[in-house]
Amino acid sequence: MLRLSERNMKVLLAAALIAGSVFFLLLPGPSAADEKKKGPKVTVKVYFDLRIGDEDVGRVIFGLFGKTVPKTVDNFVALATGEKGFGYKNSKFHRVIKDFMIQGGDFTRGDGTGGKSIYGERFPDENFKLKHYGPGWVSMANAGKDTNGSQFFITTVKTAWLDGKHVVFGKVLEGMEVVRKVESTKTDSRDKPLKDVIIADCGKIEVEKPFAIAKE
């Protein structure tokens, strides 16, 4: 009886191991649809401390996609740090359109006709891999194909009609409520804020390990 019992135990153990293996094999892995949902990876962050008139309204932190659009990101980071001797600090958001976007980055003239990149006055469109998926995406303003400089805009709604025309390179990670404050500021007939919207301070925040964000 003892030998039979041992044999039965071995059979039961083997059956349990097989069942466990089958269960493991049946567990669903990541589907192709899940993989497609993964967004671009944030490799570095930049912060803006914004002021409207005399009021400090808060900090906006951007996540930038250095693996997807490295040249565009390097330009934005260098202009935020001022490491080339020029950049965004004390420049204005010169154009604000509610339910569309806020635009800044013209640190040479302040009216949307100026600005320059770290590569020269203009540089080519890097790629259009990313789209304007919704509020908070950061994209290069331009005057047509291959005319990127320093001007950029932050979407406040989905702007699909800009896809393939403007290079998307970042997303607001924190401070979207600050962007909304800027979006709600009063403007004149040419979309210029009645009170100056200033980047009072800006700089770079290192990212230890790149992380993906959703395309939304």
Swiss-Prot record:
Domain PPIase cyclophilin-type: 47-204
Entry keyword annotation includes Signal: yes
Catalytic activity of the protein: [protein]-peptidylproline (omega=180) = [protein]-peptidylproline (omega=0)
Record's keyword annotation contains Oxidoreductase: no
Chief localisation class: virion
Any one GO cellular component localisation term in the record: extracellular exosome
Annotated S-S bridges: none
Location in the cell: Virion; Endoplasmic reticulum lumen; Melanosome
GO biological process, one term: positive regulation of multicellular organism growth
Regulation: Inhibited by cyclosporin A (CsA).
Sequence positions bearing S-nitrosocysteine: C202
Subunit structure: Interacts with DYM. Interacts with CALR, CLGN and CANX. Part of a large chaperone multiprotein complex comprising DNAJB11, HSP90B1, HSPA5, HYOU, PDIA2, PDIA4, PDIA6, PPIB, SDF2L1, UGGT1 and very small amounts of ERP29, but not, or at very low levels, CALR nor CANX.
UniProt protein name: Peptidyl-prolyl cis-trans isomerase B
Species per Swiss-Prot/TrEMBL record: Homo sapiens
